[in-house]
Amino acid sequence: MTEPIKLTFELDRKQMISANDRLHFQKKAKITKFLRQLAHYEGQNTLRDYFGLPFNEGKPCKVIVWVFAPTNRRYDPPNWSPTSKALLDGLTDAKFWTDDNYHVIKSTDFRHGGKSGNKKYRIELEIVNE
């Protein structure tokens, strides 16, 4: 299938990790585990046969990370890379791709998506055939 796969995650700020955060390693590990399990669960609910998953070296993809913030404050979308990395690892666990290395995921782009419309952040992963 050539249409993109879109996965949406609604998260509180306390459920996310920014590159600017200076967290204790145990707290960071707990949040990472939560995000990874959440993405694994969402990945299991995706119609893998319909989308022709898993992606592999012969069938690479690219990932676009859309960040929707709850306020109009300025921020840097790439600062949410620790959050998106944990989500991508969860999708690896769900067998979305054979591995999340550069042979399979050719690029990861971070983009501002606008306001989330509520008090939570919304992270949308758009996975497109390369």
Residue ranges of model-derived segments:
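Catalytic phosphate/metal-binding cores of nucleic-acid and nucleotide-processing enzymes, i.e., regions
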Residues: M1-E130
